[in-house]
Amino acid sequence: MTHTKSEELFRRAVEKIPGGVNSPVRAFRSVGGQPVFIARGQGSHLFDVDGNEYIDYVGSWGPLILGHRHPEILAALERALEIGTSFGAPTEQEIDLADAIIDAVPSVEMVRLVNSGTEATMSAIRVARGFTGRDLVVKFEGCYHGHVDSLLVKAGSGMATLGIADTQGVPKAFADTTIPLPYNSLDALEEAFRAHGDRIAAVIVEPVVGNMGCVPPLPGYLEGMRAITERYGALLIFDEVMTGFRVAFGGAQQLYGIKPDLTTLGKVIGGGLPVGAYGGRKDIMSKVAPAGPIYQAGTLSGNPLAVAAGLAMLRHLKRNPQVYTRLEECGARLAAAAPKGVTVNRVGSMFTFFFTDGPVTDWESAKRCDTSRFGEFFRGMLDRGVYLAPSQFEAAFVGAAHSDEDIAKTIEAAKTA
């Protein structure tokens, strides 16, 4: 497998774009080599500029649960393009998408559309502070909530991949409003609330972590978190940008039966286009401008193309609940075929092969992974036509377009990678 044209494009890119990429993990820094440049996608497969074909387990980092170029998504986009690309004014389709989200996600009574997961979490934090009149926020080590200044403390995703504990450019005063705690430890959460309970506005959490690899909650963890926040009058925010409509139609909150106060969404709800949303209890969301005093706005919020693609996606998933059964089956088959000496974490169609012998339940245990071994495995799989996330600390995704043949080829590739 050759990558001559990708290498040529990367040489051009590094002269014009920081690091040659528009999001750090794409640069392959942690796995070695240079990124492949994609020419097109179809179904469960990617095709690079050198003509190489890959079975895709990145799925644009989660949004493409139905695969690339799904006909219903394309048809919705074509209809939307005939009408216009952006209006900066309300449309009926925005209400339809809001209805679809509220219908599916148990805790959401009102919802505001934005343009990214980062915007969604940033806005949810502001709303939580405005609603409670408090300033501190609890987050968890290895969880990533977008590149919001105060949430880039001990964050996951690209910061974990590149080994950056805390980014430059965030004033200490911003970081001091964030309390980072170990994930899956109720004792640590209790201690934080005993010390600062009257100042904590919210706890924000990925209910299933995807940004230090896939790390599910231990039994009772989310239930305990819900009880603690209620006892102290703090809001519980589920960051379901990754898990929303992915681990279940109603997200992780449906899967685990826990209702947060606020929820952030993205990825799947845009059908592959840039989008985000935050929503929750009506008494909280009614404080958002212009209905209330907590300001948030966006020129392209509710963009008709993203709304059209997202609405088509959610309607398809609602009509076809068997999609989730298929995703569970494929995820289980892949997990069962993990290489020796590897710990597999999986929730539905999210999974990670952790190159460590021990269980991975938090950031400290994830950090013990042999990232060099993962890099070798990644490159071996890439050479065999399987495209995984280029980081030990990112989840992989099964999509509805993955065929039995795709799964079988992936399992066979893993035996020799």
Curated annotation (Swiss-Prot):
Q: Which residues carry this modification: N6-(pyridoxal phosphate)lysine?
A: 267
* Source species, domain of life: Bacteria
Protein's UniProt keywords contain Cytoplasm: yes
Q: What is its EC number?
A: 5.4.3.8
Recorded GO cellular component terms are:
cytoplasm
- Assign the protein's first listed, main location to one coarse class: cytoplasm
Asked whether the UniProt record includes Phosphoprotein among its keywords, one would answer no
Broad enzyme group:
isomerase
Q: In which pathway does it act?
A: Porphyrin-containing compound metabolism; protoporphyrin-IX biosynthesis; 5-aminolevulinate from L-glutamyl-tRNA(Glu): step 2/2
**Which UniProt key words apply to this protein?**
Cytoplasm, Isomerase, Porphyrin biosynthesis, Pyridoxal phosphate
> Where's it found, cell-wise?
Cytoplasm
One Pfam entry for this protein is: Aminotran_3
Q: Which reaction(s) does the protein catalyse, per the Swiss-Prot or TrEMBL entry? A: (S)-4-amino-5-oxopentanoate = 5-aminolevulinate
* Cofactor or coenzyme needed: pyridoxal 5'-phosphate
The record's Gene Ontology biological-process terms are:
protoporphyrinogen IX biosynthetic process
Please name the GO terms that the record assigns under molecular function.
glutamate-1-semialdehyde 2,1-aminomutase activity; pyridoxal phosphate binding; transaminase activity
Record InterPro entries: 4pyrrol_synth_GluAld_NH2Trfase, Aminotrans_3, Aminotrans_3_PPA_site, PyrdxlP-dep_Trfase, PyrdxlP-dep_Trfase_major, PyrdxlP-dep_Trfase_small
**What does the similarity note say?**
Belongs to the class-III pyridoxal-phosphate-dependent aminotransferase family. HemL subfamily.
Q: How does it assemble?
A: Homodimer.
PANTHER family, from UniProt? GLUTAMATE-1-SEMIALDEHYDE 2,1-AMINOMUTASE, GLUTAMATE-1-SEMIALDEHYDE 2,1-AMINOMUTASE 1, CHLOROPLASTIC-RELATED
Q: What is this protein called?
A: Glutamate-1-semialdehyde 2,1-aminomutase
Q: Which organism is it from?
A: Solibacter usitatus (strain Ellin6076)
